[in-house]
Amino acid sequence: MKVRNSLKSLRSRHRDNRLVRRKGRVYVINKVQRRFKARQG
């Protein structure tokens, strides 16, 4: 999992990326290509 300041650019890398908020943290998840997983930090 990548940790990035800005998730907007990471979200645009694949069309199946989803922006999810869990426990006060923002994540990018992708059910199809799981290597696009990222967390904001």
From Swiss-Prot:
Keyword check for Ribonucleoprotein: yes
GO molecular function terms attached to this record: structural constituent of ribosome
GO cellular component term of the entry, any: ribonucleoprotein complex
GO annotation, biological process: translation
Sorted UniProt keywords: Ribonucleoprotein, Ribosomal protein
Keyword Ribosomal protein: yes
Secretion signal span: none
NCBIfam families: PRK00831.1, rpmJ_bact
HAMAP family: Ribosomal_bL36
Recorded family membership: Belongs to the bacterial ribosomal protein bL36 family.
Protein name: Large ribosomal subunit protein bL36
Species for this entry: Rhodopseudomonas palustris (strain BisB18)
Species classification: Bacteria, Pseudomonadati, Pseudomonadota, Alphaproteobacteria, Hyphomicrobiales
Name of the encoding gene: rpmJ
